[in-house]
Amino acid sequence: MGEPTWEAAEDPDRTLRERLRRGRTLLVSPHPDDVAYSCGGLLAAVGRPAHATLLTVFTRSAWALPRRLRRAGARVVSERRREEELRYCRLRGLAEYRPLGFADAGLRGYDDETELSSPAEADGVRGAVEEAVAEAIRDAGADTVLAPAAVGGHVDHLLVHGAVRGAVGPGGPLTLFYEDLPYAGQRDAVDVERTLREARGLVPFASVDISGVVQQKVRGMYVYGSQTDDECVRETLRHARRGAPRRWTGGTAGAGHAAGRRGAPHTERVWTPAPAGAR
């Protein structure tokens, strides 16, 4: 596995794209659609990763936007979502798809409110998720791992975030965290920043300019037709237009470069754990 030595690059955006084009990448998604929503612009900008695996943790679900599909039940919904994942892998040139088969929060008894307010530590599936994610990271042999930052506090995202943080130690792959969408787009920008820096202990790694590929990102979102509506797309793009790079200051990785590229209409940010003692 590669050493995480790219953080000090003069142009972290370009360096990250080149890293994904040349190396082995593990894309960790709590549910089908999270990668497409949250870092699909980065993947579109990369073009075709050298070898990328999409690892989706909670792949059993009864939720879908179309009422007819919802009425068909969890087995049919889960199969539809698997088909959407495979189409997305083909669209983005991802080499492998690895579903872990866990039931999502809705099937575990959460409702719309409790899935966004419950601590991951109390969930009985936590240990099994941590074990499965750790095994998948070992098997992937990736030099870069992209995983959710758990912005928004969805219990499934918290479980996956914690599992990845626990699985990757010193000398492991470069581990980066994307801003969970559309959740980040539904929250005040200051609150998002506070969650990332204070609650998660992360610092900026790169602000990826996706302006030239934003329509490709949207196309990838609509691959997940069972989940994606126009409101979701609007929230996602609104977050990308917030101009977040101009707020980055100080001695964090990528901050100077991002601040210098003012006015990029659409961006995706990725974060990395703060150095020990930096919080």
UniProtKB/Swiss-Prot annotation:
InterPro entries registered for this protein in UniProt: GlcNAc_PI_deacetylase-related, LmbE-like_dom_sf
Biased composition (Low complexity): 246-258
Enzyme Commission designation: 3.5.1.112, 3.5.1.113
Region called Disordered, residue ranges: 245-279
One example GO MF annotation: metal ion binding
GO biological processes: neomycin biosynthetic process
Protein name per Swiss-Prot or TrEMBL: 2'-N-acetylparomamine deacetylase
Protein family membership: Belongs to the PIGL family.
A matching Pfam family: PIG-L
Named cofactor requirement(s): Zn(2+)
Function: Deacetylase involved in the biosynthesis of neomycin by mediating 2 steps of the pathway. Deacetylates both 2'-N-acetylparomamine and 2'''-acetyl-6'''-hydroxyneomycin C.
Signal sequence segment: none
UniProt keyword list: Antibiotic biosynthesis, Hydrolase, Metal-binding, Transferase, Zinc
Catalytic activity: 2'-N-acetylparomamine + H2O = paromamine + acetate; 2'''-acetyl-6'''-hydroxyneomycin C + H2O = 6'''-deamino-6'''-hydroxyneomycin C + acetate
Organism encoding this protein: Streptomyces fradiae
